[in-house]
Amino acid sequence: MVAVAILAAGRGTRMKSDLPKVLHQLGSCTLVKRVIKSCVSIQPSKIMVIVGYRGGLVQKSLLDNNNNIDNDNTPTLEFVEQTEQLGTGHAIQQLLPYLKDFSEELLVLNGDVPLLRPETIKQLIDTHQQNKNSATILTANLPNPKGYGRIFCNTNNFVTQIVEERDCTAAQTKNHRVNAGVYCFNWPALANILPKLKADNDQQEYYLTDVVPLLDPVMAVDVNDYQEIFGINNRKHLAKAHEILQVRVKDDWMEAGVTLIDPDSITIDDTVLLQQDVIVEPQTHIRGSSIIGSGSRIGPGSLIENSHIGKNTSVLYSVISDSMVADNTRIGPYAHLRGDSQVGSHCRIGNFVELKKATVGDRSNAAHLSYLGDATLGEKVNIGAGTITANYDGVKKHKTKIGDRSKTGSNSVLVAPVTLGEDVTVAAGSVVTKNVEDDSLVIGRARQAVKKGWRLKQSDESKKEENKSSP
C-alpha cells in the first residue's frame, strides 16, 4: 500500500492574496483538490495534507468538498500541521509521529502542481516497486530549464547527482533533465534519514532533495508530457495552467466526437460530460457537473453550470445553472434557468424568460418576456408574453400551479399562492389572485371604458383656459 503526503503549507506570497495558494481555483477545483483527485486511482492507504498558512481554512475547504472527490476510493483525509515553513524536508519530518508503524511506500506530491495525470503517478509507483528503490524521482526534460536544478543519471536511469542551477558548470547546464518535485520513497529508509537533515544553506531551510545522496538506489522516471509538472507560483502561472488544462480537455472531447466551432473561445471544465455529436458554439462555457446529451447545440454566448441538457436540445445566448432540460427543447435567446428548474421535452423557453425553481411539463411554451418562479406547469401549457408569477409577499415565497393545456394571455400576473386547473384560459392583462377551476376563462382586469369625443372636449377646455389667461 502507498501513503500520500501533499505539501500544502505555503502561503504563496507571489499570488498577492490572503487566500492560501493551494486554494486558488483551476477550473472547477482548487489546486490542492486537483492534486488529491490525481492520486485517488492508486487507492492509497491514507492521504495526509501538510498544512501551515491558514491551515484551518485549507482543512475546511477540503472536508467540505470531500464528497466531490471520490468517496469509493478516497480514504479520510488527514491533516498534519507544519507550524513553521522551514522547507520541504522539514514538512516531511512532520510525518514521523504519524507513520511510526508504517513500512510501505510514501508518495510525495506538491499542492501547487495540479496537472499531473493519474497515469503518470501510477508509472512512478510501479517503477519504484518493481525496482525496489529507496527513492524514485519524477523528472522532465524541459525545453527551457532555466531556474531548475539538474538531475544526472547513469544509463539505467539511476540518479548519480542533483546539481542546483547556480552550481552547474557550463557543460552541466546543457542537461535539460530537471526534478519535478514528485517522489516515491521507501518510508522506513526515508524515516531513518529525515532526522539527519541540516539547514546548511542560504535560506536556512531543510530540503527534501538533500536526502537523495543518502539513499540507494534512487531512480528517475521521465514524465511523458513536461507540462504535467507545471507549478503555480503567481497569477500568470495560474492562467497558463488553465490554458494547458483547457487544451487537454477540449482535445479529448474533439477526439471523442464533439464539435467545437471555435475552441479558443470555449471553456469546458474537466468535470463535464459531453455525448457524441454535441456542437458547442463560440463564446460558450460549460462548467461543473454539467452533462450535455447527444445532438444538442450549445451557444453561441451561453453558460451551462451544474446542469443536465437532454438530447437534440438547443441553447442560444442563455444561462442555465443547477437545472435540467429534457430532449428536443429550445432555450433562448437570452433565457435564464436557475435554482433547480426542470424543463420537459419539446418545450420552448424563449426570449428574456427567467425560470427559478420552476417545473415545465412536456410541450409547454414560455416564449417571451416572462418570470416563472416557484411554479409548476403541466403539459401543453402556453405562457403569454409578459406573464409573471408573483411569488414573493415580502416575507416568504409561494407556489403557482398551472394545469395541462392552460394558457395565459399577455401581461398576466398570477399572484401566488394560486392554482389554475386544466384547460384554463387567462385573459390578457389579468391579475389572478384566486384559484381557478378546470375549463374556465378568468378575467381579472378593469372593464374597458370608451369616452367618445373626449379629445375634442379636452381641447375645448384647454382653449377656454388659454383665453382666460390672455391679457
Curated annotation (Swiss-Prot):
Annotated Mg(2+) binding sites: D112, N233
Residues passing through the membrane, by range: none
Pathway(s) this gene product operates in, as recorded in its UniProt entry: Nucleotide-sugar biosynthesis; UDP-N-acetyl-alpha-D-glucosamine biosynthesis; N-acetyl-alpha-D-glucosamine 1-phosphate from alpha-D-glucosamine 6-phosphate (route II): step 2/2; Nucleotide-sugar biosynthesis; UDP-N-acetyl-alpha-D-glucosamine biosynthesis; UDP-N-acetyl-alpha-D-glucosamine from N-acetyl-alpha-D-glucosamine 1-phosphate: step 1/1; Bacterial outer membrane biogenesis; LPS lipid A biosynthesis
Segments of this protein annotated with the region Linker: 236-256
GO cellular component: carboxysome; cytoplasm; membrane
Spans annotated as Pyrophosphorylase: 1-235
Gene3D superfamilies (UniProt xref): Hexapeptide repeat proteins (2.160.10.10), Spore Coat Polysaccharide Biosynthesis Protein SpsA, Chain A (3.90.550.10)
Active site: H368
Cofactor: Mg(2+)
Pfam families for this protein: Hexapep (PF00132), NTP_transferase (PF00483)
Binding positions for acetyl-CoA per the UniProt entry: A385, N391, Y392, S410, A428, R445
Protein's cellular compartments: Cytoplasm
Function per UniProt: Catalyzes the last two sequential reactions in the de novo biosynthetic pathway for UDP-N-acetylglucosamine (UDP-GlcNAc). The C-terminal domain catalyzes the transfer of acetyl group from acetyl coenzyme A to glucosamine-1-phosphate (GlcN-1-P) to produce N-acetylglucosamine-1-phosphate (GlcNAc-1-P), which is converted into UDP-GlcNAc by the transfer of uridine 5-monophosphate (from uridine 5-triphosphate), a reaction catalyzed by the N-terminal domain.
Listed name of the protein: Bifunctional protein GlmU
Species: Trichodesmium erythraeum (strain IMS101)
Organism placement in taxonomy: Bacteria, Bacillati, Cyanobacteriota, Cyanophyceae, Oscillatoriophycideae
